[in-house]
Amino acid sequence: MKKDILNKYNINNQEIEIKSDLASEFPVYIYLSEKKDYLLYSTSIKQLLDSEEVNKPLKTTIEGISFLLQSGVVPLPNTVYQNIFIVSIGNTAKVKTVNNKIEIEFSYHFPFMNKDRDDEADIDEKFILETLAEATISRLEKDRDSYLFHSAGKDSNSIALALAEAGYQNQVTCISHQSKGDKDESEISQKIAKQLGFKHQKLYDPKELNEKYLYSINTFFENAPFPSMDGVTLAYPLYATQINFDGTNLIDGMGNDTFIGHIPSKLEFERQRKLSRYHNLRPFVDKLDSYGRVKVATNTRSEWTGLFGISYRDTSKILKNSYNAYSYWKNIDVERNNFDYLDFRASLRGTLIDQEIFTRKIRNFADITNSNLILPWTNQKVAQYFSKLPERYLFDRKELKNKLILRKILKNKIGLDSDKLGKMAYSFDFYAILMMMKDYVDNQILFCKLWNNIEIKKLLNSFYHKIDSNHRLSWRYKTLVQRLYLISVWYNTNKYVNN
Protein backbone atom coordinates (compact mmCIF):
# COMPACT_ATOMS: atom_id res chain seq x y z
CA MET A 1 0.00 0.00 0.00
CA LYS A 2 1.35 3.41 -0.94
CA LYS A 3 1.72 5.87 1.91
CA ASP A 4 -0.98 8.56 2.28
CA ILE A 5 -3.05 7.35 -0.68
CA LEU A 6 -6.81 7.06 -0.10
CA ASN A 7 -7.90 3.61 -1.24
CA LYS A 8 -11.45 2.39 -1.84
CA TYR A 9 -13.09 -1.02 -1.73
CA ASN A 10 -16.52 -1.37 -3.36
CA ILE A 11 -19.12 -4.12 -3.09
CA ASN A 12 -18.12 -7.28 -4.98
CA ASN A 13 -14.50 -6.24 -5.34
CA GLN A 14 -12.05 -9.10 -4.87
CA GLU A 15 -11.29 -9.93 -1.23
CA ILE A 16 -8.38 -7.93 0.16
CA GLU A 17 -6.19 -8.15 3.24
CA ILE A 18 -5.09 -4.97 5.03
CA LYS A 19 -2.02 -4.90 7.27
CA SER A 20 0.29 -2.24 8.62
CA ASP A 21 4.06 -2.46 8.40
CA LEU A 22 5.83 -4.56 11.05
CA ALA A 23 6.17 -1.97 13.86
CA SER A 24 3.33 0.25 12.67
CA GLU A 25 5.35 3.19 11.45
CA PHE A 26 2.30 3.76 9.28
CA PRO A 27 -0.92 2.40 10.85
CA VAL A 28 -3.79 1.87 8.43
CA TYR A 29 -7.08 3.65 9.12
CA ILE A 30 -10.34 2.17 7.83
CA TYR A 31 -13.77 3.72 7.32
CA LEU A 32 -16.78 1.50 6.61
CA SER A 33 -19.85 3.32 5.33
CA GLU A 34 -23.04 3.07 7.39
CA LYS A 35 -24.75 1.08 4.65
CA LYS A 36 -21.66 -1.12 4.31
CA ASP A 37 -21.56 -0.48 0.59
CA TYR A 38 -18.03 0.95 0.39
CA LEU A 39 -14.87 1.06 2.47
CA LEU A 40 -12.01 3.58 2.53
CA TYR A 41 -8.54 3.02 3.92
CA SER A 42 -5.33 5.03 4.17
CA THR A 43 -2.17 5.46 6.23
CA SER A 44 -3.25 9.09 6.73
CA ILE A 45 -6.07 9.55 9.24
CA LYS A 46 -6.39 13.20 8.26
CA GLN A 47 -6.84 12.32 4.61
CA LEU A 48 -9.42 9.71 5.55
CA LEU A 49 -11.46 11.92 7.88
CA ASP A 50 -11.34 14.90 5.54
CA SER A 51 -12.72 12.84 2.65
CA GLU A 52 -16.17 13.90 1.43
CA GLU A 53 -17.08 10.20 1.34
CA VAL A 54 -16.82 9.98 5.13
CA ASN A 55 -20.16 11.00 6.65
CA LYS A 56 -19.80 13.69 9.28
CA PRO A 57 -20.30 14.48 12.06
CA LEU A 58 -18.74 11.22 13.19
CA LYS A 59 -20.60 9.22 15.80
CA THR A 60 -18.83 8.06 18.94
CA THR A 61 -19.61 4.77 20.66
CA ILE A 62 -20.63 4.30 24.28
CA GLU A 63 -18.21 1.38 24.45
CA GLY A 64 -15.36 3.57 23.22
CA ILE A 65 -16.07 6.33 25.74
CA SER A 66 -16.39 3.68 28.48
CA PHE A 67 -12.91 2.37 27.68
CA LEU A 68 -11.42 5.87 27.66
CA LEU A 69 -12.87 6.52 31.12
CA GLN A 70 -11.87 3.22 32.71
CA SER A 71 -8.69 2.27 30.84
CA GLY A 72 -7.49 5.37 29.02
CA VAL A 73 -7.53 3.67 25.62
CA VAL A 74 -9.90 1.87 23.24
CA PRO A 75 -8.73 -1.67 22.32
CA LEU A 76 -7.74 -1.97 18.68
CA PRO A 77 -8.88 -2.40 16.00
CA ASN A 78 -11.85 -0.43 17.37
CA THR A 79 -11.73 3.30 18.00
CA VAL A 80 -13.91 5.81 19.81
CA TYR A 81 -15.83 6.22 16.51
CA GLN A 82 -18.45 4.04 14.91
CA ASN A 83 -17.21 2.42 11.69
CA ILE A 84 -13.62 3.66 11.97
CA PHE A 85 -10.88 1.16 12.73
CA ILE A 86 -7.10 1.09 13.10
CA VAL A 87 -4.90 -1.71 11.78
CA SER A 88 -1.69 -1.57 13.79
CA ILE A 89 0.98 -3.98 15.09
CA GLY A 90 -0.23 -7.56 14.69
CA ASN A 91 -3.66 -6.66 13.29
CA THR A 92 -5.03 -7.98 10.00
CA ALA A 93 -8.29 -6.96 8.34
CA LYS A 94 -9.81 -9.24 5.69
CA VAL A 95 -12.34 -7.32 3.62
CA LYS A 96 -14.91 -9.12 1.48
CA THR A 97 -18.48 -8.90 0.22
CA VAL A 98 -21.13 -11.18 1.75
CA ASN A 99 -24.80 -10.95 0.70
CA ASN A 100 -24.20 -7.59 -0.95
CA LYS A 101 -22.68 -6.09 2.21
CA ILE A 102 -19.05 -5.41 3.02
CA GLU A 103 -17.71 -7.40 5.96
CA ILE A 104 -14.44 -6.96 7.83
CA GLU A 105 -12.87 -9.90 9.63
CA PHE A 106 -10.19 -8.80 12.08
CA SER A 107 -7.50 -11.05 13.50
CA TYR A 108 -4.47 -10.54 15.70
CA HIS A 109 -1.06 -12.19 15.87
CA PHE A 110 1.73 -10.67 17.94
CA PRO A 111 4.86 -10.64 15.74
CA PHE A 112 7.54 -10.08 18.39
CA MET A 113 7.56 -13.15 20.64
CA ASN A 114 10.91 -13.54 22.39
CA LYS A 115 11.03 -17.25 21.54
CA ASP A 116 11.41 -16.28 17.87
CA ARG A 117 14.75 -14.55 18.42
CA ASP A 118 17.86 -15.94 16.74
CA ASP A 119 20.19 -17.08 19.53
CA GLU A 120 23.07 -17.32 17.05
CA ALA A 121 22.80 -13.74 15.80
CA ASP A 122 25.57 -11.31 16.64
CA ILE A 123 25.40 -7.59 17.31
CA ASP A 124 26.70 -4.91 14.94
CA GLU A 125 26.87 -1.50 16.62
CA LYS A 126 27.87 0.28 13.42
CA PHE A 127 24.90 -1.25 11.59
CA ILE A 128 22.54 -0.13 14.38
CA LEU A 129 23.58 3.52 14.12
CA GLU A 130 23.68 3.50 10.33
CA THR A 131 20.22 1.92 10.12
CA LEU A 132 18.75 4.40 12.62
CA ALA A 133 20.29 7.27 10.66
CA GLU A 134 18.92 5.92 7.39
CA ALA A 135 15.46 5.45 8.93
CA THR A 136 15.48 9.12 9.90
CA ILE A 137 17.25 10.78 6.98
CA SER A 138 15.24 8.91 4.34
CA ARG A 139 12.06 10.42 5.79
CA LEU A 140 13.28 14.03 6.12
CA GLU A 141 11.49 16.33 3.72
CA LYS A 142 13.72 19.01 2.26
CA ASP A 143 13.15 22.71 2.88
CA ARG A 144 11.45 22.00 6.22
CA ASP A 145 12.83 22.82 9.65
CA SER A 146 13.58 19.62 11.57
CA TYR A 147 13.19 19.01 15.31
CA LEU A 148 14.15 16.02 17.45
CA PHE A 149 12.24 15.60 20.73
CA HIS A 150 15.29 14.98 22.88
CA SER A 151 15.82 13.91 26.49
CA ALA A 152 18.36 12.18 28.69
CA GLY A 153 16.93 8.84 27.59
CA LYS A 154 18.37 6.05 25.51
CA ASP A 155 15.95 6.19 22.59
CA SER A 156 16.28 9.83 21.53
CA ASN A 157 20.02 9.88 22.23
CA SER A 158 20.57 6.86 20.01
CA ILE A 159 18.85 8.76 17.21
CA ALA A 160 20.86 11.92 17.95
CA LEU A 161 24.12 9.95 17.92
CA ALA A 162 23.18 8.22 14.67
CA LEU A 163 22.37 11.55 13.00
CA ALA A 164 25.58 13.12 14.30
CA GLU A 165 27.73 10.30 12.95
CA ALA A 166 25.93 10.70 9.61
CA GLY A 167 26.83 14.42 9.58
CA TYR A 168 23.31 15.81 10.03
CA GLN A 169 23.94 18.01 13.09
CA ASN A 170 23.34 21.22 11.18
CA GLN A 171 19.98 20.08 9.83
CA VAL A 172 18.20 19.14 13.06
CA THR A 173 17.46 21.07 16.28
CA CYS A 174 17.16 19.14 19.54
CA ILE A 175 14.30 20.30 21.77
CA SER A 176 13.61 19.29 25.36
CA HIS A 177 11.10 20.21 28.05
CA GLN A 178 12.42 21.90 31.17
CA SER A 179 10.62 20.13 33.99
CA LYS A 180 10.35 21.24 37.58
CA GLY A 181 12.29 19.42 40.29
CA ASP A 182 15.06 16.84 40.17
CA LYS A 183 13.65 14.98 37.16
CA ASP A 184 14.50 17.78 34.74
CA GLU A 185 16.28 16.34 31.71
CA SER A 186 16.78 19.56 29.75
CA GLU A 187 20.26 20.36 31.15
CA ILE A 188 21.55 16.90 30.27
CA SER A 189 19.87 17.12 26.88
CA GLN A 190 21.42 20.51 26.19
CA LYS A 191 24.88 19.25 27.15
CA ILE A 192 24.64 16.18 24.91
CA ALA A 193 23.25 18.20 22.00
CA LYS A 194 26.18 20.62 22.26
CA GLN A 195 28.63 17.73 22.50
CA LEU A 196 27.24 16.21 19.29
CA GLY A 197 27.08 19.55 17.47
CA PHE A 198 23.29 20.10 17.43
CA LYS A 199 21.43 23.30 18.12
CA HIS A 200 19.26 22.98 21.23
CA GLN A 201 16.15 24.73 22.46
CA LYS A 202 14.33 24.36 25.77
CA LEU A 203 10.55 24.33 26.07
CA TYR A 204 9.06 25.84 29.21
CA ASP A 205 5.98 25.56 31.40
CA PRO A 206 3.93 28.78 31.35
CA LYS A 207 3.84 30.91 34.49
CA GLU A 208 0.36 31.99 33.47
CA LEU A 209 -2.01 31.23 30.62
CA ASN A 210 -2.35 33.91 28.01
CA GLU A 211 -4.70 34.15 25.04
CA LYS A 212 -2.08 32.64 22.74
CA TYR A 213 -1.89 29.44 24.76
CA LEU A 214 -5.66 29.17 25.21
CA TYR A 215 -6.09 29.59 21.46
CA SER A 216 -3.50 26.86 20.89
CA ILE A 217 -5.37 24.52 23.26
CA ASN A 218 -8.64 25.15 21.45
CA THR A 219 -7.00 24.58 18.07
CA PHE A 220 -5.47 21.32 19.28
CA PHE A 221 -8.72 19.73 20.47
CA GLU A 222 -10.76 21.11 17.61
CA ASN A 223 -8.51 19.40 15.06
CA ALA A 224 -7.23 16.27 16.86
CA PRO A 225 -8.29 13.18 14.87
CA PHE A 226 -8.53 11.08 18.04
CA PRO A 227 -8.72 11.75 21.77
CA SER A 228 -5.51 10.97 23.67
CA MET A 229 -5.40 10.32 27.41
CA ASP A 230 -1.65 10.82 27.75
CA GLY A 231 -0.70 12.86 30.80
CA VAL A 232 1.40 15.24 28.72
CA THR A 233 -1.17 15.89 26.00
CA LEU A 234 -1.55 19.51 27.11
CA ALA A 235 2.18 20.09 26.67
CA TYR A 236 1.88 20.07 22.89
CA PRO A 237 -0.36 23.14 22.55
CA LEU A 238 2.14 24.80 24.90
CA TYR A 239 5.06 23.85 22.64
CA ALA A 240 3.23 25.30 19.65
CA THR A 241 3.29 28.75 21.29
CA GLN A 242 7.09 28.64 21.61
CA ILE A 243 8.08 27.13 18.26
CA ASN A 244 6.21 27.30 14.98
CA PHE A 245 5.92 23.61 14.14
CA ASP A 246 3.69 24.12 11.09
CA GLY A 247 5.04 22.12 8.17
CA THR A 248 8.16 20.87 9.99
CA ASN A 249 9.86 17.49 10.29
CA LEU A 250 9.14 16.09 13.78
CA ILE A 251 11.43 13.29 14.97
CA ASP A 252 10.50 11.26 18.05
CA GLY A 253 12.13 8.28 19.75
CA MET A 254 9.03 6.30 20.70
CA GLY A 255 8.16 2.84 19.45
CA ASN A 256 10.97 0.36 20.16
CA ASP A 257 10.01 -1.35 23.44
CA THR A 258 7.68 -3.76 21.67
CA PHE A 259 10.55 -5.53 19.91
CA ILE A 260 13.60 -4.53 21.97
CA GLY A 261 12.16 -5.84 25.26
CA HIS A 262 9.19 -4.41 27.15
CA ILE A 263 10.63 -4.58 30.65
CA PRO A 264 8.50 -3.72 33.70
CA SER A 265 9.67 -2.30 36.99
CA LYS A 266 10.40 -4.87 39.69
CA LEU A 267 7.38 -3.64 41.64
CA GLU A 268 5.03 -4.12 38.68
CA PHE A 269 6.46 -7.55 37.91
CA GLU A 270 5.98 -8.79 41.47
CA ARG A 271 2.51 -7.31 41.84
CA GLN A 272 1.15 -8.85 38.63
CA ARG A 273 2.72 -12.20 39.57
CA LYS A 274 1.20 -12.27 43.04
CA LEU A 275 -2.06 -10.34 42.70
CA SER A 276 -3.55 -10.82 39.22
CA ARG A 277 -5.14 -14.10 40.38
CA TYR A 278 -7.50 -12.06 42.57
CA HIS A 279 -9.12 -10.12 39.74
CA ASN A 280 -12.34 -12.17 40.07
CA LEU A 281 -13.08 -10.19 43.22
CA ARG A 282 -13.35 -7.02 41.15
CA PRO A 283 -17.18 -6.87 40.88
CA PHE A 284 -17.46 -6.96 44.67
CA VAL A 285 -14.58 -4.59 45.37
CA ASP A 286 -15.87 -2.05 42.87
CA LYS A 287 -18.97 -1.58 45.00
CA LEU A 288 -16.90 -0.83 48.10
CA ASP A 289 -13.65 0.85 47.19
CA SER A 290 -13.33 2.19 43.67
CA TYR A 291 -9.82 3.65 43.82
CA GLY A 292 -7.97 2.35 46.88
CA ARG A 293 -5.39 -0.37 47.38
CA VAL A 294 -8.00 -3.12 47.43
CA LYS A 295 -9.21 -2.08 43.97
CA VAL A 296 -5.65 -2.07 42.63
CA ALA A 297 -5.10 -5.53 44.11
CA THR A 298 -7.88 -6.86 41.84
CA ASN A 299 -6.28 -5.68 38.61
CA THR A 300 -6.24 -8.10 35.73
CA ARG A 301 -2.88 -8.99 34.27
CA SER A 302 -3.72 -6.67 31.38
CA GLU A 303 -4.37 -3.77 33.71
CA TRP A 304 -1.03 -4.26 35.48
CA THR A 305 0.68 -3.19 32.25
CA GLY A 306 -0.52 0.39 32.80
CA LEU A 307 -4.29 0.53 32.34
CA PHE A 308 -6.27 2.41 34.96
CA GLY A 309 -8.99 4.99 35.25
CA ILE A 310 -12.41 5.79 36.61
CA SER A 311 -14.15 2.83 38.22
CA TYR A 312 -17.00 1.09 36.46
CA ARG A 313 -19.25 2.03 39.38
CA ASP A 314 -18.66 5.73 38.71
CA THR A 315 -18.59 5.28 34.93
CA SER A 316 -22.07 3.73 35.03
CA LYS A 317 -23.36 6.74 36.98
CA ILE A 318 -22.10 9.42 34.60
CA LEU A 319 -22.43 7.54 31.28
CA LYS A 320 -25.71 5.90 30.36
CA ASN A 321 -25.53 2.27 29.14
CA SER A 322 -21.80 2.18 29.84
CA TYR A 323 -19.64 -0.88 29.18
CA ASN A 324 -17.59 -2.63 31.87
CA ALA A 325 -14.01 -2.68 30.58
CA TYR A 326 -12.98 -5.25 33.18
CA SER A 327 -14.79 -8.02 31.29
CA TYR A 328 -12.75 -7.30 28.16
CA TRP A 329 -9.37 -7.30 29.93
CA LYS A 330 -10.30 -10.49 31.77
CA ASN A 331 -10.81 -12.20 28.41
CA ILE A 332 -7.48 -10.90 27.09
CA ASP A 333 -5.80 -12.45 30.13
CA VAL A 334 -7.36 -15.80 29.21
CA GLU A 335 -6.49 -15.54 25.50
CA ARG A 336 -2.82 -14.80 26.26
CA ASN A 337 -2.51 -17.01 29.29
CA ASN A 338 0.47 -18.86 27.78
CA PHE A 339 2.49 -15.63 27.31
CA ASP A 340 5.19 -14.98 29.90
CA TYR A 341 4.89 -11.49 31.35
CA LEU A 342 7.52 -9.89 29.11
CA ASP A 343 5.78 -11.14 25.97
CA PHE A 344 2.40 -10.29 27.47
CA ARG A 345 3.48 -6.75 28.33
CA ALA A 346 4.91 -6.18 24.87
CA SER A 347 1.79 -7.57 23.20
CA LEU A 348 -0.54 -5.32 25.18
CA ARG A 349 1.26 -2.24 26.45
CA GLY A 350 3.53 -2.18 23.41
CA THR A 351 0.82 -2.49 20.78
CA LEU A 352 -1.95 -0.56 22.55
CA ILE A 353 -0.83 1.79 25.33
CA ASP A 354 2.36 2.81 23.55
CA GLN A 355 0.59 3.20 20.20
CA GLU A 356 -2.72 4.75 21.18
CA ILE A 357 -1.82 6.77 24.30
CA PHE A 358 1.83 7.76 24.05
CA THR A 359 2.44 7.88 20.30
CA ARG A 360 -1.09 8.99 19.47
CA LYS A 361 -0.57 12.38 21.12
CA ILE A 362 2.30 13.24 18.78
CA ARG A 363 0.51 11.74 15.78
CA ASN A 364 -2.36 14.09 16.61
CA PHE A 365 0.05 17.00 16.95
CA ALA A 366 1.70 16.24 13.62
CA ASP A 367 -1.69 16.07 11.88
CA ILE A 368 -2.78 19.37 13.47
CA THR A 369 0.42 21.18 12.45
CA ASN A 370 0.71 19.50 9.03
CA SER A 371 4.10 18.19 10.11
CA ASN A 372 6.01 15.21 8.80
CA LEU A 373 6.25 12.79 11.72
CA ILE A 374 9.33 10.56 11.75
CA LEU A 375 9.53 7.64 14.19
CA PRO A 376 12.88 6.01 13.32
CA TRP A 377 12.53 3.18 15.82
CA THR A 378 9.36 1.96 14.08
CA ASN A 379 11.12 1.65 10.73
CA GLN A 380 10.64 -1.81 9.20
CA LYS A 381 14.36 -2.52 8.82
CA VAL A 382 15.13 -1.36 12.37
CA ALA A 383 12.31 -3.45 13.85
CA GLN A 384 13.27 -6.57 11.87
CA TYR A 385 16.88 -6.35 13.02
CA PHE A 386 16.20 -5.87 16.72
CA SER A 387 13.35 -8.38 16.84
CA LYS A 388 15.75 -11.18 15.90
CA LEU A 389 18.64 -10.28 18.20
CA PRO A 390 19.27 -12.59 21.18
CA GLU A 391 17.93 -11.44 24.52
CA ARG A 392 21.43 -11.17 26.00
CA TYR A 393 22.09 -8.05 23.93
CA LEU A 394 18.81 -6.39 24.78
CA PHE A 395 17.59 -7.10 28.29
CA ASP A 396 18.24 -8.94 31.53
CA ARG A 397 15.24 -10.93 32.75
CA LYS A 398 16.64 -11.44 36.24
CA GLU A 399 17.54 -7.81 36.90
CA LEU A 400 14.68 -6.45 34.74
CA LYS A 401 17.11 -4.17 32.95
CA ASN A 402 16.33 -2.98 29.43
CA LYS A 403 18.09 -1.77 26.27
CA LEU A 404 21.50 -3.16 27.20
CA ILE A 405 23.10 -2.53 23.81
CA LEU A 406 21.92 1.09 23.74
CA ARG A 407 23.31 1.66 27.24
CA LYS A 408 26.67 0.31 26.06
CA ILE A 409 26.79 2.34 22.84
CA LEU A 410 25.81 5.61 24.51
CA LYS A 411 28.25 5.17 27.39
CA ASN A 412 31.14 4.39 25.06
CA LYS A 413 30.33 6.99 22.42
CA ILE A 414 29.12 10.03 24.37
CA GLY A 415 29.71 9.16 28.02
CA LEU A 416 26.01 8.87 28.87
CA ASP A 417 25.83 6.45 31.80
CA SER A 418 22.18 5.41 31.93
CA ASP A 419 22.86 3.06 34.85
CA LYS A 420 24.21 5.88 36.97
CA LEU A 421 21.62 8.39 35.79
CA GLY A 422 18.66 6.15 36.55
CA LYS A 423 15.13 6.51 35.26
CA MET A 424 14.25 10.11 34.42
CA ALA A 425 10.71 9.91 33.09
CA TYR A 426 9.36 12.90 31.20
CA SER A 427 7.63 15.19 33.70
CA PHE A 428 4.90 17.73 32.93
CA ASP A 429 2.74 19.35 35.61
CA PHE A 430 -0.57 19.00 33.80
CA TYR A 431 -2.60 19.67 36.94
CA ALA A 432 -1.00 23.08 37.42
CA ILE A 433 -2.10 23.94 33.88
CA LEU A 434 -5.63 22.72 34.57
CA MET A 435 -5.84 24.84 37.71
CA MET A 436 -4.70 27.94 35.81
CA MET A 437 -7.90 27.61 33.77
CA LYS A 438 -10.06 25.82 36.33
CA ASP A 439 -13.34 27.56 35.45
CA TYR A 440 -12.88 26.67 31.79
CA VAL A 441 -11.95 23.07 32.67
CA ASP A 442 -14.94 22.66 34.97
CA ASN A 443 -17.34 24.07 32.39
CA GLN A 444 -16.04 21.75 29.68
CA ILE A 445 -16.63 18.76 31.98
CA LEU A 446 -19.90 19.79 33.61
CA PHE A 447 -21.65 20.85 30.41
CA CYS A 448 -20.45 17.98 28.21
CA LYS A 449 -23.46 16.18 26.74
CA LEU A 450 -21.89 12.78 27.28
CA TRP A 451 -22.44 12.91 31.02
CA ASN A 452 -25.34 12.82 33.44
CA ASN A 453 -25.07 16.42 34.66
CA ILE A 454 -25.98 15.65 38.27
CA GLU A 455 -23.64 12.67 38.66
CA ILE A 456 -20.70 14.30 36.87
CA LYS A 457 -20.84 17.23 39.28
CA LYS A 458 -20.78 14.86 42.26
CA LEU A 459 -17.89 12.88 40.81
CA LEU A 460 -15.79 15.92 39.91
CA ASN A 461 -16.31 17.46 43.34
CA SER A 462 -15.33 14.19 45.02
CA PHE A 463 -12.07 14.14 43.04
CA TYR A 464 -11.30 17.73 43.99
CA HIS A 465 -12.03 16.96 47.63
CA LYS A 466 -9.55 14.06 47.63
CA ILE A 467 -6.92 16.25 45.97
CA ASP A 468 -7.43 19.21 48.33
CA SER A 469 -7.24 16.95 51.38
CA ASN A 470 -3.83 15.64 50.25
CA HIS A 471 -5.16 12.12 49.93
CA ARG A 472 -2.38 9.54 49.59
CA LEU A 473 -3.61 8.88 46.04
CA SER A 474 -4.08 12.55 45.14
CA TRP A 475 -1.85 12.10 42.06
CA ARG A 476 -4.31 9.55 40.72
CA TYR A 477 -7.32 11.81 41.31
CA LYS A 478 -5.49 14.59 39.46
CA THR A 479 -5.08 12.20 36.54
CA LEU A 480 -8.79 11.37 36.63
CA VAL A 481 -9.76 15.06 36.58
CA GLN A 482 -7.52 15.47 33.56
CA ARG A 483 -9.08 12.45 31.89
CA LEU A 484 -12.58 13.86 32.31
CA TYR A 485 -11.33 17.12 30.83
CA LEU A 486 -9.51 15.53 27.88
CA ILE A 487 -12.56 13.52 26.87
CA SER A 488 -15.01 16.37 27.45
CA VAL A 489 -13.12 19.15 25.68
CA TRP A 490 -12.42 16.89 22.71
CA TYR A 491 -16.07 15.81 22.48
CA ASN A 492 -17.34 19.38 22.92
CA THR A 493 -15.12 21.09 20.38
CA ASN A 494 -13.77 18.58 17.86
CA LYS A 495 -14.64 19.38 14.26
CA TYR A 496 -15.10 15.75 13.27
CA VAL A 497 -17.65 15.15 16.03
CA ASN A 498 -19.37 18.53 15.77
CA ASN A 499 -19.22 19.16 12.02
What are these regions (language model features)?
Residues 1-204, 208:
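Cysteine-centered catalytic environments shared across enzyme families
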Residues 22-26, 45-48, 154-156, 181-182, ...:
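Short, solvent-exposed loop/turn segments at secondary-structure junctions
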Residues 84, 304-499:
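Adenosyl-5′-phosphate
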Residues 125-148, 241, 245, 354-360, ...:
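Phosphate/ATP-binding catalytic cores across multiple sugar-kinase/actin-like superfamilies
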Residues 166, 217-221, 261-274, 499:
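Short secondary-structure boundary/capping segments
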Residues 186-222, 249-254, 325:
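A conserved beta-strand->alpha-helix junction
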Residues 229-244, 347-354:
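A conserved donor-nucleotide-binding helix/loop in the catalytic core
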Residues 237-317, 361-382:
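Active-site adenylate/phosphate-handling loop in enzymes that bind or generate adenylated species
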